[in-house]
Amino acid sequence: MKIDPVELTKKLISFKSITPRDDGAIEHIAAILEKSGFDCEILEFGDNKTKVKNLYAKYINGVQNLCFAGHVDVVPPGQLKDWISDPFSPEVRDGLLYGRGATDMKSGIAAFITAMVDLVAEKFRFNGSISALITSAEESTEEYGTKAVLKWMESKHKKIDYCVVAEPTSSEKLGDTIKIGRRGSATFELICHGKQGHVAYPDLADNPIYKMISILNRIKDTTFDGGNKYFQPSNCEITTIDVGNSTDNVILDSITAGFNIRYNNMQTPDGLYKLIDEICFSVTNDYKLSMHSSRGAFLSTPDRNTDVMFDAINKVTNIDAVLATSGGTSDAAFIKDVCPVIEFGMINKTSHQVNECVLVNDIHKLTAIYKEFIKSYFYPTNRILNQINVIGNVPDSPLLA
């Protein structure tokens, strides 16, 4: 059986899989893979409020297991009137396929599913096994998505040796960027307390706003680190300040602020919390600090398989990719705990935007790249076996592409 990656992308877009729903996409992919001889496990995790469907599918032909990972869930489309067409009714215009998830990341999933199915149909002799890990909870309820699947795999003694996550990593042209790591994300909420009073009698009140201003200024002036060869310096951005005051003559008794630290592999969430807590305590002891951090910073040191991806990209696109660790978080942060992982996929310019779109021709190119990668992963050429240039050519400056 052979499939058309563009038609599969269209079909996946047609599923209204607003996170954490899959709307039938998981079952559709499983049906395709089962017809090609894959063993498929549809896994549902969740609680009374949320149920998340995931898929782990494996074509068994040996111990070594190459896995492709991705997510079918998408963010909400926003105002429908702003779209040139229905975001869940895929439409091709001037060589571009429009629809929610076209870039992030239904085209990537369609490409690696097609690559695997095509190779099976071509009777390619995998020197090992190939698998797919697909979730419908990357954009939101991550606890029941990839993270839960990996825990299930561990309990069943199922192993992954290497993983490619099909996130849209390219910047300007398909093939220009491979992600070998990501910064972690730590989100803080700080509440400073004071005493309510009349603005005409500040001596009888305790204005918490000044405490918050002092703390946020100290956080802003803090140098967390200087970055390193792979990562830019850790950075904090204030995202909200709220006192909920509807009048102009009252000093309220509390103020809340939110801020996010994107941190590199020199930091840990616990270390950041301790540092922020010390800054708060240096100003006041009447505060409450909380932190949420799920996906940590990670780095997959470039290796032979990075070279395999470089060569596959160059063979199809004639582009020399660069390595990067920039951008937001992804499920690769969970996968890195079980095996080496890289991310490579479509151009990221329209992800999460109105009129999200992808070049139709790029879907075919990405499929070809994944096929080349799979073949060379299992049967590396002598040039790849003797190649160590990727590790030696990592630039001295952080990977900010």
Curated annotation (Swiss-Prot):
Cofactor field: Zn(2+); Co(2+)
Catalytic function, reaction form: N-succinyl-(2S,6S)-2,6-diaminopimelate + H2O = (2S,6S)-2,6-diaminopimelate + succinate
Source organism, top-level taxon: Bacteria
Active site: 73, 138
Sequence positions that bind Zn(2+) 2: 104, 139, 352
InterPro entries reported in the protein's UniProt record: Bact_exopeptidase_dim_dom, DapE_proteobac, Peptidase_M20, Peptidase_M20_dimer, Peptidase_M20A
Binding-site positions, Zn(2+) 1: 71, 104, 167
One matching Pfam family: M20_dimer
E.C. number(s) listed in UniProt: 3.5.1.18
Cofactor comment text: Binds 2 Zn(2+) or Co(2+) ions per subunit.
One of the record's GO molecular function terms: acetylornithine deacetylase activity
Disulphide linkage map: none
Keywords: Amino-acid biosynthesis, Cobalt, Diaminopimelate biosynthesis, Hydrolase, Lysine biosynthesis, Metal-binding, Zinc
BP GO annotations: diaminopimelate biosynthetic process; L-arginine biosynthetic process; lysine biosynthetic process via diaminopimelate
Pathway membership, UniProt: Amino-acid biosynthesis; L-lysine biosynthesis via DAP pathway; LL-2,6-diaminopimelate from (S)-tetrahydrodipicolinate (succinylase route): step 3/3
Primary enzyme class: hydrolase
Function as written in the Swiss-Prot or TrEMBL entry: Catalyzes the hydrolysis of N-succinyl-L,L-diaminopimelic acid (SDAP), forming succinate and LL-2,6-diaminopimelate (DAP), an intermediate involved in the bacterial biosynthesis of lysine and meso-diaminopimelic acid, an essential component of bacterial cell walls.
Assembly: Homodimer.
Annotated family: Belongs to the peptidase M20A family. DapE subfamily.
Protein name per Swiss-Prot or TrEMBL: Succinyl-diaminopimelate desuccinylase
Lineage start: Bacteria, Pseudomonadati, Pseudomonadota, Alphaproteobacteria, Rickettsiales
Gene: dapE
